[in-house]
């Protein structure tokens, strides 16, 4: 597992992962991960960082190897670009602008916003905007930009992620709380001023330096790609796509069954039933009006052979 175990002490030192916050700005719960203090700054124990980071990378690879998805969350300024780039590279989802309350716990409502965003994008592409007044188009464009900013990273997320990766749990505490309520595992890059409670996979490290953020985010992305490759190699991706298609077909059949026969079919059925009853009533009347009883079809069929015999 190149991605799951591909992090070294040298990489951590070069990225400045070991630099924590000032000693007066610390959370006592991070004490087990602190090596010591130097010049009023806590130094993080990188040996523990290596072990815990590798464990997190393996977990992510296993998640994506089973077809699961990972949600990258980094809304602080120095994390936004890195998180967006790496999550996109890995084919995963991300939140970099602002965490909307209920993104996980009220995903049904979030999907309504996503549907609205897709509708506006379609209107812009198919020329609908060109037929609308300029003032209305400007309003719709502003709405689309706002939705893209907040929901663009989860636009293709059709179901809840199997894992959430956050930069700076102190800032992303709402996301962590929502994931905890739903039982979604959380991986976090946790600095010395953060509370590690609620983080399933703690990665002790500097969550402010861009190089540190880049290092761990890229490793998580590589773990996602590694797991996705295993998933495709196993053939599970094709099976899941087939099951999803069959599920859509089944849902369509159930909708048709609930609708019942079409109106035209019901009219045809009534006409057929009425014609049979009408024929039954008219049959005896014809026989009564005639001078002689009307022969049935069956005797005629039986009489045919006698006629043939006479001809012979």
Curated annotation (Swiss-Prot):
Keywords, ordered alphabetically: Ribonucleoprotein, Ribosomal protein
Gene Ontology biological process terms from the UniProt entry: translation
Basic and acidic residues: compositionally biased ranges: 245-284
Region (Disordered): 232-312
Highest rank taxon of the organism: Bacteria
Signal peptide span: none
Phosphoprotein found in the keyword field: no
GO molecular function: structural constituent of ribosome
PROSITE patterns reported in the protein's UniProt record: RIBOSOMAL_S2_1, RIBOSOMAL_S2_2
Gene3D superfamilies assigned: Glucose-6-phosphate isomerase like protein, domain 1 (3.40.50.10490), Helix hairpin bin (1.10.287.610)
Record flagged with keyword Aminoacyl-tRNA synthetase: no
Ranges of compositional bias, category Low complexity: 291-312
Pfam families: Ribosomal_S2
Any one Gene Ontology cellular component term annotated for this protein: cytosolic small ribosomal subunit
Family from the record: Belongs to the universal ribosomal protein uS2 family.
PANTHER family: 30S RIBOSOMAL PROTEIN S2 PROKARYOTIC AND ORGANELLAR, SMALL RIBOSOMAL SUBUNIT PROTEIN US2M
HAMAP family listed in its UniProt record: Ribosomal_uS2_B (MF_00291_B)
The protein, known as: Small ribosomal subunit protein uS2
Phylogenetic placement of the source organism: Bacteria, Pseudomonadati, Myxococcota, Myxococcia, Myxococcales
